[in-house]
């Protein structure tokens, strides 16, 4: 299968690209290489004859059209994805996440692409409950995004679904929970905490630290995406969570333990504006396709910490350039 992977130099996109190539698929990565896109994530496949990289933006309709020609399928990762950055300046989120998605929908139709998997997020549902176990969103629940980031992702979902209902766009949408693993840009909470702790720096904890997230290992998420690509119904949405709900405080304390650091490094900070209390999704629909998360959270976290310990040359330049 010849697949176009937009945003394939990012965290999840690069992991999925490597999975596809290992499976024998032909992959074209199309990435704008903004601050979170990094070709070092793809070094192990850059000489593979089944891999090709195109430097381009999903808002560049002409270049995207030239790139998509001849592909069998598209997996659309390309997005601006950091909540705090969206609060500071929503403009690039609107452009990339909304206009970029509309461009891709047009070109999938024009080029008669067989399958289009759109990568969304559990954040489009908004917050649910205040404690672990207090309900979960299903795919039928209304979208109530809270941040400019999640609002643009919800808009992108609706754009893609509107193209399905109006034009028969062969799209399936997957809404994963929070991801973690190697090669994640160090502004995100887990790599931010790990890299700070490895350097003896404080870990900034918003508010009371009791906001809850469900954590899924990136390898499990890649398997979920592949399941939707191969088995997902057109016009359907699939939640993909792992059931590893943790408060941010619990997460910080576990990472302090794994990094052999001191709890005094936890530094409470002013809460994020509009901070969602808890995300939780019901993943029964994708379970019916045969996907179930396999990675134990604590073991996955240990492996992730070890990766950042062994790969300072990867994250130190990224962290320094983003400060």
Where are these predicted regions, by residue range?
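Short beta-loop-alpha junction of Rossmann-like oxidoreductase domains
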Residues: 127-129, 182-184, 188, 285
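A conserved short alpha-helical segment within the catalytic HATPase_c
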Residues: 160, 190, 194, 252-256
